[in-house]
UniProtKB/Swiss-Prot annotation:
It comes from Amycolatopsis orientalis (Nocardia orientalis). Its EC number is 2.4.1.310. CDD domains: GT1_Gtf-like (cd03784). This is Vancomycin aglycone glucosyltransferase. In A.orientalis different glycosyltransferases are involved in biosynthesis of the vancomycin group of antibiotics. GtfA (AC P96558), GtfB and GtfC (AC P96560) are involved in biosynthesis of antibiotic chloroeremomycin, while GtfD (AC Q9AFC7) and GtfE (AC G4V4R9) are involved in biosynthesis of vancomycin.
């Protein structure tokens, strides 16, 4: 049996699929992965065949200017078209297709799977995105009247907005390969049987009328040692505070403001350069900049983790028992910020842009013995087998060819 995994997103979208790929392979199936060209080295590390699809996922971060509305429209057009152009050859002979991340790409992937008669599966990294009549949808970043309409109407409004953005492009490509038009974009891309690749303690699945399954987060154990230089820095003093924004750019002056606040608490700093290639504001001996490292090990040796609130970073920090301060920038990050605060394992910063005072106050909470104790306690409840659970679920579903889980 051969399985195709596909995504066009950033590290936060690709890394869970890397974990799933390894666990599917462990069960004896062949696996290949369609992903941006940036993923070549990572997939080579774990021995998963890589089919480069689409442009570099780093391109939006490395732009000199912010994305405009026209840029977003062009990206959407290309994301949908790329799936129709590239996925068919990669999916040929596969028994199933699994995708995560951008809806614009997912609807293209499912269309190809439909044409080839291949079962299709979609996984969320955040339960708040699972459509439900019992809680409101996450904001789409556009003017909304959601406070004046009921919850099902809010989801339908967002679904119609998705159709307005994607429907014409999608159905044009579908018509070209002999497929009927799609109107319900959410159900088509997400299916009525989605998976939730998030931890049930950190991000519990809420009531939904869909046949959703929560597997736990898809995280591959990382056995890599820390570099001698980083290990020496850690050994040279008390646990530092980690600062990083992953594959996002940092808000203006956020690095300087954060380091000033951390220093004011008498703590050292580890700055993750990330995709934006962040730099330290000075050459102080109390700061250390890092590139690619084993965060699973590193987070177990820091006093706190200040980050953007991506699902992957939040899960890894929670599993390591590290207190967190989340500066949510977009998408599912406000949700994870709220959950960290609700669990008592850290602080949800009010808004994406920190000030010295706001971060100082957040650190005053995150660095307390009480927060550390709570983070340690919650760490013991976080599942470590999510990718293995999903791999078994996938292969069992395909083998049984159950209509409730196949396209």
């Amino acid at each position: 049996m051969r399985v195709l995994l596909a995504t066009c997103g950033s590290r936060g979208d690709t890394e869970p699929l890397v974990a799933l790929a390894v666990r599917v392979r462990d069960l004896g199936a062949d696996v290949r992965m369609c992903a941006p060209p940036d993923c070549a080295e990572r997939l080579a590390e774990v021995g998963v065949p890589h089919v480069p699809v689409g442009p570099s996922a780093r391109a939006p971060i490395q732009r000199a200017k912010p994305l405009t509305a026209e840029d977003v429209r062009r990206f959407t057009t290309e994301a949908i078209a790329t799936q129709f152009d590239e996925i068919p050859a990669a999916a040929e002979g596969c028994a199933a297709v699994v995708t995560t991340g951008l809806l614009a790409a997912a609807i293209g992937v499912r269309s190809v799977a439909e044409k080839l008669g291949i079962p299709y599966f979609y996984a969320f990294h955040c339960p708040s995105y699972v459509p439900s009549p019992y809680y409101p949808p996450p904001p789409l970043g556009e003017p909304s009247t959601q406070d004046t309409i009921d919850i099902p109407a809010q989801w339908e409004r967002n679904n119609q907005s998705a159709y307005q953005r994607y429907g014409g492009l999608l159905n044009s490509h579908r018509d070209a390969i002999g497929l009927p038009p799609v109107e319900d974009i959410f159900t088509f891309g997400y299916t009525d049987h989605p998976w939730v690749a998030a931890d049930p303690v950190l991000a519990p699945l809420q009531p939904t009328d869909l046949d959703a399954v929560q597997t736990g987060a898809w995280i591959l154990p990382d056995e890599r040692p820390l570099s001698p230089e980083l290990a020496a820095f850690l050994d040279a003093g008390p646990p530092p505070v980690y600062l990083g924004f992953g594959s996002l750019g940092a808000p203006a002056d956020a690095v300087r403001v954060a380091i000033d606040a951390i220093r004011a608490h008498g703590r050292r700093v580890i700055l993750s350069r990330g995709w934006a290639d962040l730099v330290l504001p000075d050459d102080g001996a109390d700061c250390f900049a890092i590139g690619e490292v084993n965060h699973q090990v590193l987070f177990g040796r820091v006093a706190a983790v200040i980050h953007h609130g991506g699902a992957g970073t939040t899960h890894v920090a929670a599993r390591a028992g590290a207190p967190q301060i989340l500066l949510p920038q977009m998408a599912d990050q406000p949700y994870y910020a709220g959950r960290v605060a609700e669990l008592g394992v850290g602080v949800a910063h009010d808004g994406p842009i920190p000030t010295f005072d706001s971060l100082s106050a957040a650190l005053a909470t995150a660095l307390t013995p009480e927060t550390h104790a709570r983070a340690t306690a919650v760490a013991g409840t976080i599942r470590t087998d999510g990718a293995a659970v999903a791999a078994r679920l996938l292969l069992d579903a395909v083998s049984r060819e159950k209509p409730t889980v196949s396209a």
